[in-house]
């Protein structure tokens, strides 16, 4: 299977899915490689955060999605480090060009006291399942949205995106 997301990705004939986009999706998100993440996004994404107490967007533009996830109030915060690990997965083929990936997920987060990343201020980890939506465009699978459902959180997960250095700076 090709690991390149800029060319056509080999797909499973039964599910129409691509493991490469799912793996790369999380690799890029955890590494905060914004350019690579942007390259695998569909033009429009379905983003449903209602089961975690947030909003739902039926048609969020890729640019708006990138602005949201890379913002200092979220994953773009230089004091927040994260790693998203995928566990068990199954694929649901909706059509020739649409697939839903059902993923078991653990997202580990650490917030540091400053951007030098020397002192950990707090930790917060989440255990969840996640529906990921994929669409095939010109023979290439693109990430087209997500719908997480948290099972439980560890430590101070609720404070991860509120407790960082940059958030303290904004409140001063």
Swiss-Prot record:
<feature type="active site">
    <location>
        <position position="84"/>
    </location>
</feature>
<keyword id="KW-0456">Lyase</keyword>
<comment type="function">
    <text>Scytalone dehydratase-like protein; part of the Pks2 gene cluster that mediates the formation of infectious structures (appressoria), enabling these fungi to kill insects faster. The product of the Pks2 gene cluster is different from the one of Pks1 and has still not been identified.</text>
</comment>
<dbReference type="InterPro" id="IPR032710">
    <property type="entry name" value="NTF2-like_dom_sf"/>
</dbReference>
<dbReference type="Pfam" id="PF02982">
    <property type="entry name" value="Scytalone_dh"/>
</dbReference>
<comment type="subunit">
    <text>Homotrimer. Each subunit contains an active site, located in the central part of the hydrophobic core of the monomer, which functions independently.</text>
</comment>
<feature type="binding site">
    <location>
        <position position="130"/>
    </location>
    <ligand>
        <name>substrate</name>
    </ligand>
</feature>
<protein>
    <recommendedName>
        <fullName>Scytalone dehydratase-like protein Arp1</fullName>
        <ecNumber>4.2.1.-</ecNumber>
    </recommendedName>
</protein>
<feature type="binding site">
    <location>
        <position position="49"/>
    </location>
    <ligand>
        <name>substrate</name>
    </ligand>
</feature>
<dbReference type="GO" id="GO:0006582">
    <property type="term" value="P:melanin metabolic process"/>
</dbReference>
<dbReference type="InterPro" id="IPR004235">
    <property type="entry name" value="Scytalone_dehydratase"/>
</dbReference>
<dbReference type="InterPro" id="IPR049884">
    <property type="entry name" value="Scytalone_dh"/>
</dbReference>
<comment type="similarity">
    <text>Belongs to the scytalone dehydratase family.</text>
</comment>
<dbReference type="GO" id="GO:0030411">
    <property type="term" value="F:scytalone dehydratase activity"/>
</dbReference>
<feature type="active site">
    <location>
        <position position="109"/>
    </location>
</feature>
């Amino acid at each position: 299977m090709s690991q390149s997301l800029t060319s056509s990705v080999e797909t499973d004939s039964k599910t129409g899915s691509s493991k490469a986009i799912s793996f790369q999706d999380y690799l890029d998100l955890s590494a905060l490689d914004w350019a690579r993440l942007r390259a695998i996004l569909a033009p429009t994404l379905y983003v449903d955060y209602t089961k975690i107490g947030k909003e739902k967007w039926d048609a969020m533009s890729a640019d708006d999605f990138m602005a949201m996830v890379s913002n200092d109030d979220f994953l773009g915060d230089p004091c927040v480090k994260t790693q998203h690990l995928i566990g068990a997965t199954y694929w649901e083929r909706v059509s020739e060009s649409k697939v839903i990936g059902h993923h078991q997920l653990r997202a580990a987060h650490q917030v540091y006291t400053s951007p030098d990343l020397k002192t950990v201020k707090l930790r917060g980890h989440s255990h969840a399942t996640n529906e990921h939506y994929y669409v095939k465009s010109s023979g290439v699978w693109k990430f087209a949205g997500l719908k997480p459902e948290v099972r439980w959180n560890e430590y101070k997960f609720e404070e991860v995106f509120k407790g960082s250095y940059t958030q303290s700076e904004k409140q001063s």
